[in-house]
């Protein structure tokens, strides 16, 4: 049997991230959450998301009753799984790095989009399951619109947030506020 493991949201600007574990043969699918707090300042610098990923993968494999003697894991190539790889090697777990596509990828990206829409309130029609620059700017613009209330959702441990994007977000927020005031007068 084969278990696929993938992530979503680990490189996105805001919100929680998610790990998905999927047993192909039975269709069993489970999710685990990496809190946005893990991606802030010291937690990020101390690689807390990578440590938590190991814990969550272990927990997910237990729930799926994983048997290392007759199952293989197809593991997403993402950096979030770097310490998971070490764990698999130490435990003699048979795994392959792979590009995860199909049902699991769709499900775990869907979990992220649901979180962004339903938990955080991102309403843009431009928000899709496809990661990349377009999604970054949808999320960035959402933060800018109400910066001081939404900054708490930012993965502020990311270096570029503190060296580039935070200042740009404040600047954009201030421009929007001035524009709103002009419209009222």
Locate the predicted segments by residue:
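RNase H-like, Mg2+-dependent phosphodiesterase core
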Residues: 1-185
């Amino acid at each position: 049997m084969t278990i696929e493991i993938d992530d979503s949201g680990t490189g996105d600007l805001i919100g929680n991230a998610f790990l998905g574990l999927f047993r192909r043969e039975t269709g069993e699918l489970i999710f685990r959450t990496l809190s946005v707090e893990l991606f802030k300042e010291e937690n990020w610098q101390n690689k807390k998301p990578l440590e938590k990923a190991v814990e969550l993968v272990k927990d997910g494999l237990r729930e799926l009753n994983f048997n290392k003697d007759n199952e293989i894991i197809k593991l997403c190539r993402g950096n979030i799984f770097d310490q998971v790889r070490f764990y698999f090697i130490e435990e003699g777990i048979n795994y392959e790095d792979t590009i995860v596509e199909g049902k699991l990828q769709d499900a775990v990206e869907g979990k992220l989009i649901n979180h962004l829409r339903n938990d955080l309130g991102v309403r843009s029609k431009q928000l899709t399951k496809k990661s990349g620059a377009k999604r970054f700017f949808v999320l960035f613009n959402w933060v800018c619109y109400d910066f001081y209330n939404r900054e708490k959702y930012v993965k502020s441990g990311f270096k570029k947030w503190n060296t580039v994007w935070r200042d740009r977000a404040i600047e954009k927020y201030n421009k929007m506020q001035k524009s709103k005031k002009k419209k009222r007068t």
